[in-house]
Structure formats: C-alpha cells, structure tokens
C-alpha cells in the first residue's frame, strides 16, 4: 500500500485505463488535478484548449477516434457550464466521455441553505448534469473517490455508451488516500451472446432486402466486421448520416445516406425495399421522417437490432421486430452463419439495379458545394479523418465526399451543434496521430474559432476547410420554404450577420492559410493537405443552397425539384416501377 493525493490517484486511474490524453482549461478549483497531470506528463498529456466547450468537443473527438475514455477537466461554475454542450453531445451520440469539474470547498457548499449561492463560482452542477449523463457523482468524501471512479468508468462503457459527470470539491482533491502500489485497469462487461441466424434467413428470403447501418457500428469497434458481413450477404447498404463512412464510395453495395438532407438514391431504395435489417441506428425522425407510415411503405419486415431497449418505446412500423442485442455479439454471429450458407441465395440482380439507378442519378442535384467536397476529399489520403460541422457544409460533405478505405467522418449528429468540427479535430488528431480535416462553414467556424490557437501551439496536423458563403445557408433554405425568403440574421444584406476574412485570421494564429476561389486551385496544395503541419483553406463562393431537400419518407421521384425526364424514365425502367 502507498499514500497519494486524490488528484494523483485520479491521474493514475486514467493512465491505468489506457487514457493517453485529457482536455480541459485550468482554473482555481482544479489546480491540484492539473498539477498532478504535470507531474505525470511522461505518461499522460493534457491539452489546454481555448474554452471549456472546445475541450469537451475535443474529448468527444478523441473518444470517437480511439474508443478510449474521453476526459474533460474544468473548474467550477462557468467552467462547468461551458462544458455542458459537449456533455450533451456525448449523451445524444453515445460517446464515452467523463467530465470532471472542481467544486468549492465542502464547507463552502450551499447545502440546505435556501440561498442562490454560498461559495464563489459555486453552482448546483450535479442537478444540471443529470438529464444528459448516464450517472452523476458527487465526491464529498475521500472514500467516494476509489469506488466512485471505478463505477463511473464501468457506467460509461456498459450497455449503450455515454457520458458521466463527477463533481469534486477542491479540498477533496488534495486529501491523501491509501491505495495499491499498482492500479489495475477496469475490466469491461462482455456482451451477452445472441443467435442471429434466423434474421439472416429472413433477409435471404426477401426479394429486395437492405441493411440500414448507423453510427453504432463504429462505436462498437466493428467497422471491419461489418464490411465482412456485407461482403457475405451481398445486399445494398443504406446508412444514416453517422454511418456514412462505413462503406467506401466504390463499393457495389453502397447506396448512400438517408434523411431529409440526403440525395435521392437512398430514398428510392428505401421506398422500394421489402426487408430492412437495421444495425446500430436509433432511426431518428431526422432520418426516417416524422410521418412513419411513409417510411419503407413496401417493407414486409423491419428488424431493429438495438442495445438500448428504451428506443423501442417509439415503435415505427407494424411490421417491425425489436431485437435487444449488442452488435458485438450480433454481427459475429451473423458472419458465422452467413459463412455456412454462402451462395444459397442471390440478390445480385437487385444490387445491380441499385447501382444502375445510382449511375443514372449521379449528375442530378449537384451544387457548387457538392463539387467542392467531392474534389476536396478525392485529394485526401486513405484513412483520412474528417470532422464535420453543422449546416450546408455538412450536407455537401455527407452527400458528395469520396469515402476511401479507412475514411472516418465525425459529426455532432444528435445535438447538431455548430462549432463542433474544429475542436473535435483537435481530439481526433491527438488520438489518431494522423492528419485530420475539419470541414466548417463561416457560421460554425466562429463558434469555436479560439481552437485555432490550440491547433497552432501544439502544431497539430489539422487542415481546416472553411466554406465561406457569407451566410447561414442552411437557415436560408428554411427561410425560402417557410418565411417568403426573408433573410433575417442570415446574410449581411438581411442585417445583423457578418462573416470575416478567415485566411487572415488563420495567419494571425500562426497557421498557413490560403484563399481559394476555384475548386481546381486545391490541386496545387496536395502536399500541404498531406503533411503534418496545420493549415487553413478558405473557399469564398455565393450561397448555392441545398438539393434535393426532400423530407424523409416521401417518394423522392415525385417530390423535390423535378428530375429531367430522361433520368426519371431511366430510373423507372431500372427499378421496374
């Protein structure tokens, strides 16, 4: 046994459980924890971000890229509240994150007083965190720390992953506790076994089956296993936005992502499939539309495989069968069974028809933004990490990016927080140690622009692509549809919106920065895109809108902008309508 401070114990706990990097912002109530991080700097690194929100998003990116625990450390009061948005992001996107914030001395806490506040920068943090975490902890005694940290770590990873919160007073941080000479890693609970054979038989028996794949597959570390399963089943794959990077662009089984901001191809397939096997997706209304009867109207069976049975409280279709299972068991079981009966069924005519339809549709609904992201991602190496923001820049990215082997895309999917891509790129780059590409718009870029300093001072290999149309383009789409195109607070002409010179701003932070006016100009910067130093590219262009903008569930052939007659006729012929 040995004696060490609580702060030292917490840092050793992180090290024992494989955490290599933590993110945060120094403050009075966490000075002891930061001091301990400095003492252990040869075994763990701390990254001081430009704000607590930036640190929280960076921790999300780190956790998504590595599968490890993402740790955020902030001071009390405003430090904690600044990080709440990142905590909410982790909650909705099932990201394994732990937020630790300092708190005033236990003797200065409000306790049972009816006062608004007793200690300086005190806030009722636990009560505020509870709705957006799996569990919140209050370490008011030394004995809370050891058992509490163990339980918090298990809680993050058991079942559906998600964040936890720990509130720790400053006097507890510096107290001494006795512990074992060597801390051991927490063992994670293995998944319950499941037999997937019956569901695979049903898929093979269908005429037009598809797999609907979501971000949960990546969260479970099953990307390679999923690709193996697809190669065995040989059926089309439609993805959600978080699952968009699961299947390479050149795969014969890739259809594309679904939803109101998607291209039409996925909608056409969904409208005509007779069987859906949904893996790793909660099937949100953003994906399937708000009128569930319009979603997969011809399907005779929907099998939803979901680890969180509360998601089944929202029944989507009369034909659905709900399967509570961990994909870590379901996908290996499906692979094992598919290997035994390989060749017994042939859905290649269906696959070929889908590919022919995709080819016929490939030149439709293209904007400058689509062309830009298609060309930009074509220049990137395999295994590229791409972080996305919120707005039309995200739409262009998921619609038109070239997904190569190993490409990963990270976004704020459930919360949909602007300002995500740049700080998330910090965490992804730190965790993956390879060049990371942050795609953002002029609106989102300014939300967490301070993280350019984090990137610059650490010389992180982050390349930022700013799509500067001097407008909030995604909101303009809404204003066109519902508000007679009154562009209030979305353009400079509409009033109270202003963009800036991002290339000049990047240079001010010490980052190589370039203005791009033509897509082809990117070609001369291929070496910059692939080197290990930060860079910023600002592309100025006129707002080009978003196509086709069809609400989820509606027939994509008869809704949205009218398709050319030759394309419509070709699709109808190919799909046999």
Indicate residue ranges for each PLM-predicted region:
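N-terminal alpha/beta PP-like core and its mobile active-site loop of ThDP/TPP-dependent enzymes
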Residues: 1-338, 379, 462-464
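A structural motif corresponding to the C-terminal end of an alpha-helix
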Residues: 132, 274, 375-384, 506-511
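Generic detector of well-ordered alpha-helical packing
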Residues: 53, 168, 307, 388-390, ...
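Active-site diphosphate/adenylate-binding microenvironment
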Residues: 7-20, 25-38, 351-433, 575
């Amino acid at each position: 046994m040995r004696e060490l401070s609580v702060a030292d114990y917490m840092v050793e706990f992180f090290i024992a459980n494989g955490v290599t990097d933590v993110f945060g912002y120094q403050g009075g109530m966490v000075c002891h924890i930061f001091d301990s991080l400095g003492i252990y700097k040869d075994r763990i690194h701390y990254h001081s971000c430009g704000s607590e929100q930036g640190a929280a998003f960076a921790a999300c990116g780190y956790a998504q890229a590595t599968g490890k625990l993402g740790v955020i450390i902030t001071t009390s009061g405003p430090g904690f509240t600044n990080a709440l948005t990142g905590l909410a992001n982790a909650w909705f996107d099932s990201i394994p994150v732990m937020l630790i914030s300092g708190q005033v001395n236990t003797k200065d806490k409000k306790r049972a007083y009816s006062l608004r506040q007793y200690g300086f920068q005190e806030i009722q943090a636990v009560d505020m965190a509870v709705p957006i975490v799996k569990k919140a902890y209050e370490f008011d005694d030394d004995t809370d720390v050891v058992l509490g940290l163990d339980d918090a770590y298990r809680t993050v990873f058991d079942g559906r992953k998600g964040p936890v919160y720990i509130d720790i007073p400053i006097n507890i941080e510096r107290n001494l506790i006795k512990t074992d000479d060597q801390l051991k890693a927490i063992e994670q609970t293995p998944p319950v076994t499941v037999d997937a054979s019956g569901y695979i038989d049903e898929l093979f028996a269908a005429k037009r089956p598809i797999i609907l794949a979501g971000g949960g597959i990546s969260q479970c570390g099953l990307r390679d296993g999923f690709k193996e399963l697809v190669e065995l089943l040989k059926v089309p794959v439609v993805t959600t936005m978080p699952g968009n990077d699961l299947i390479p662009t050149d795969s014969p089984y890739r259809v594309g992502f679904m939803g109101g901001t998607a291209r039409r191809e996925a909608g056409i397939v969904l409208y005509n499939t007779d069987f859906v096997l949904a893996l790793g997706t909660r099937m949100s209304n953003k994906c399937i539309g708000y009128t569930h009867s319009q979603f997969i109207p011809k399907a005779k069976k929907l099998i939803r495989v979901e680890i969180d049975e509360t998601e089944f409280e929202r029944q989507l279709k009369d034909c659905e069968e709900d399967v509570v299972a961990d994909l870590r068991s379901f996908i290996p079981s499906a692979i094992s069974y598919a290997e035994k009966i390989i060749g017994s069924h042939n859905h290649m005519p269906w696959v070929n028809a889908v590919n022919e339809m995709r080819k016929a549709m490939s030149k439709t609904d293209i904007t400058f933004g689509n062309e830009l992201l298609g060309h930009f991602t074509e220049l990137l190496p395999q295994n590229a990490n791409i972080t996305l923001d919120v707005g039309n820049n995200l739409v262009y990215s998921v619609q038109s990016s070239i997904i190569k082997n190993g490409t990963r895309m990270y976004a704020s999917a459930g919360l949909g927080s602007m300002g995500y891509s740049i700080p998330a790129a910090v965490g992804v780059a730190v965790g993956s140690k390879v060049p990371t590409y942050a795609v953002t718009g002029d609106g989102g870029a300014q939300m967490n622009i301070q993280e350019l300093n984090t990137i610059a001072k650490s010389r992180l290999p982050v390349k930022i692509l700013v799509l500067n149309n001097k407008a909030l383009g995604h909101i303009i789409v809404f204003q066109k549809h519902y508000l007679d195109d009154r562009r209030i607070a979305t353009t400079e002409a509409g009033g109270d919106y202003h963009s800036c010179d991002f290339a000049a701003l990047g240079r001010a932070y010490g980052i190589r920065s370039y203005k791009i006016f033509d897509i082809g100009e990117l070609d001369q910067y291929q070496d910059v895109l692939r080197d290990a130093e930060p860079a910023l590219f600002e592309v100025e262009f006129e707002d080009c809108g978003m196509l086709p903008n069809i609400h989820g569930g509606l027939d994509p052939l008869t809704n949205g902008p009218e398709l050319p007659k030759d394309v419509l006729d070709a699709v109808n012929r190919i799909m046999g309508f």
